[in-house]
Regions:
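Conserved small/polar residues in nucleotide/adenosyl-binding loops
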Residues: 298-299
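DnaQ-like (DEDDh/DEDDy) 3′-5′ exonuclease domain used for proofreading
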Residues: 1-121, 126-180
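Flexible, glycine-/basic-rich loop-and-beta segments that form/coincide
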Residues: 232-287
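Conserved Class I SAM-dependent methyltransferase catalytic core
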Residues: 163-221
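Conserved S-adenosyl-L-methionine
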Residues: 219-230
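A short acidic (Asp/Glu
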Residues: 108-109, 131-132, 205-210, 234-237
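Short, surface-exposed basic-aromatic patches at helix termini and helix-loop junctions that form
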Residues: 111-114, 209-217, 240-241
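Conserved nucleotide-binding/hydrolysis micro-motifs of P-loop NTPases
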Residues: 125-128, 202-204, 228-231, 253-255
Length: 300
């Protein structure tokens, strides 16, 4: 099976996900030789959508490369952590904990949970210069591989490989790290799913543009200011920064919704073996600490 995946990965292109979507929903736009009929595709759109030629996009070194990484299938395997899972408190757990590279972990999750996840929260590297972030996704591509797969020249291919090999912490490296992970997270979300992403001043502007690219600017919900240090950080220049941010995007803003008015008073909560909770709109909502356990897996 792994050999088949490796063979299929050899043929993956940066726009493979988009091509798959077009083939699924617009099969009549593909000719017998596999070429895409843009004129026929335009016929589907002309009376149903306003078209603009004044858009803008985020560009960075390695963008097509990171899109290709999102399309590659993982060549790792999941190995259950039997010692952890056999503990009495974990035997009947319904949760899953995967330990390993998060890019591979997301791809494994997609095999079972694509389009099923209601809510995702991630706390990525902030790329502050002191948080230890360096780009470390390792793939055995050559300059010739990237020239062929990405349709770029040798100079740009070499720059991408140099960036990936030296463990860069540049803005481009951070964006290249984040792009495939956000794309895979989007694929996990249900049609009414939402994602929350913590970040600070160092990359919040880039993250906003990146999320607009992945989720669509129309699916932006909010950028929350989150106070995390009321006194302010001592190493701040000019102004003592006391807060970070939480970006919120939906898979589809038209159908996304939030449960309103979760009570905070203890008198409005119920306590059981799993922790404090309230019932709101017919749904159980956990509040505060809880005692849910996890099943642990490690992938190789």
């Amino acid at each position: 099976m792994i050999k088949d995946i490796m063979t299929a990965n050899e043929l993956v292109m940066p726009n493979q996900k988009e091509i798959n979507v077009l083939k699924e929903y617009f099969p009549s736009c593909f000719n017998a030789d596999g070429t895409f009929d843009m004129v026929r595709f335009s016929e589907f759109l002309k009376d149903k959508i306003d078209i603009t030629h004044e858009g803008y996009e985020l560009r960075f070194l390695g963008k097509n490369y990171s899109k290709m990484l999102a399309s590659l299938d993982t060549e790792t395997v999941i190995v259950p952590d039997e010692a952890h899972n056999s503990l009495p408190e974990n035997v009947n757990s319904e949760n899953v904990y995967i330990s390993g590279d998060n890019l591979d972990a997301l791809k494994h999750l997609l095999k079972s949970y694509a389009g099923l996840v209601k809510c995702i929260y991630i706390d990525p590297p902030y790329n502050t210069g002191s948080d230890g972030f360096v780009y470390n996704d390792k793939f055995n591509f050559t300059v010739e591989d990237l020239v062929e797969k990405l349709s770029i020249d040798e100079e740009q291919a070499q720059r991408i490989l140099d960036l990936t090999n030296r463990g860069s912490a540049s803005h481009s490296a951070w964006l290249m790290f984040m792009y495939p992970r956000l794309q895979l997270a989007k694929d996990l979300l249900d049609k009414d799913g939402v994602i929350f992403i913590s970040i600070d001043d160092n990359e919040v502007s880039n993250l906003r543009l990146l999320c607009d690219d992945v989720f669509g600017a129309e699916n932006f919900i909010s950028c929350l200011s989150v106070e995390n240090n009321p006194k302010g950080r001592k190493n701040s220049d000019f102004i003592a920064v006391s807060s970070e941010y939480c970006l919120i995007y939906s898979k589809n803003k038209e159908v996304a919704h939030f449960i309103e008015n979760v009570p905070k008073a203890a008198s409005d909560m119920t306590l059981d073996e799993n922790g404090n909770y309230v019932h709101n709109s017919g749904k159980r909502v956990l509040v505060g600490e809880n005692n849910f356990n996890t099943v642990s897996y490690t992938h190789l």
